Amino acid sequence: MKRSDRYKTYNKPNDSNDSNQLHHNTYFKPVNKPQKKKKGKGIILKLLIPILIIIGIIIGVMYALSLRADTDELKNITEKESFVYASDMRDYTKGAFIAMEDERFYKHHGFDVKGTSRALFSTLSDKSVQGGSTITQQVVKNYYYDNEQSITRKIKELFVAHRVEKEYDKNEILSFYMNNIYYGSDQYTIESAANHYFGVTTDKNNPNLPQISVLQSAILASKINAPSVYNINDMSDNFTNRVKTDLEKMKQQGYISNSQYENAIQELGV
């Protein structure tokens, strides 16, 4: 063999290498497939953005509507004949309502994120407005939106409650609440309810009537959940259990001592 032929043989392209190279390139072709995921994310974003815009518009409208509520009008509650400021009540009387209705009352600024989220979720799933409102929200609902039952009311309620918290201190808000809620038998203030049901007063500065007791405070705080159903003179098991629960919460949250709790439970007869 000629030297030149040997040179050509040694430098001849290797077919096996070409096939390996071809196989190598084919193996890496799937690398481009993740582009489908990007398309999927794009579709989700296209659907999500309009939804967020609609939600934003609804919230904006509800905020504008909430501005119609004049928070100065809440002061009208203080003009009731039997109005008593919360600062003039026993701590356990105030505690009976806070423990049962809004244990984080002194910590939040009008609404409790956990409670409100739970209430809105229940409203959406059950198609009915559920509880979970703070005392401030209940003040707003009772004064401005008493007959309105809807999700939009909940949203307006949040905005107004935040304004109320900025304009009034906690003592004033609690006073508005306890003096503008239905206790049954045509009683709408805690003082008139205490007079009517027990012949006592909630005003610690009033020397003309006996002071409301721990148990009586818990009974009134429990009754507002179903004022037309719960009968103080003939307490059902549900009503009794609710009062007991309130007393337990009052003790746990430091509004009453162990001895006060035990005495109240003994009076309750459970």
From Swiss-Prot:
Subcellular location: Cell membrane
Record has Ubl conjugation as a keyword: no
GO cellular component term of the entry, any: plasma membrane
InterPro entries xref list: Glyco_trans_51, Glycosyltr_51/Transpeptidase, Lysozyme-like_dom_sf, Monofunct_glyco_trans, PBP_transglycosylase
Catalytic activity: [GlcNAc-(1->4)-Mur2Ac(oyl-L-Ala-gamma-D-Glu-L-Lys-D-Ala-D-Ala)](n)-di-trans,octa-cis-undecaprenyl diphosphate + beta-D-GlcNAc-(1->4)-Mur2Ac(oyl-L-Ala-gamma-D-Glu-L-Lys-D-Ala-D-Ala)-di-trans,octa-cis-undecaprenyl diphosphate = [GlcNAc-(1->4)-Mur2Ac(oyl-L-Ala-gamma-D-Glu-L-Lys-D-Ala-D-Ala)](n+1)-di-trans,octa-cis-undecaprenyl diphosphate + di-trans,octa-cis-undecaprenyl diphosphate + H(+)
Top enzyme category: transferase
Comp. bias intervals (Polar residues): 11-24
GO MF term set: peptidoglycan glycosyltransferase activity
Record keyword Ligase present: no
Residue ranges crossing the lipid bilayer per the database entry: 47-67
Major location category of this protein: membrane
Pathway: Cell wall biogenesis; peptidoglycan biosynthesis
Region (Disordered) location: 1-35
Protein name stated in the entry: Monofunctional glycosyltransferase
Organism: Staphylococcus saprophyticus subsp. saprophyticus (strain ATCC 15305 / DSM 20229 / NCIMB 8711 / NCTC 7292 / S-41)
Gene: mgt
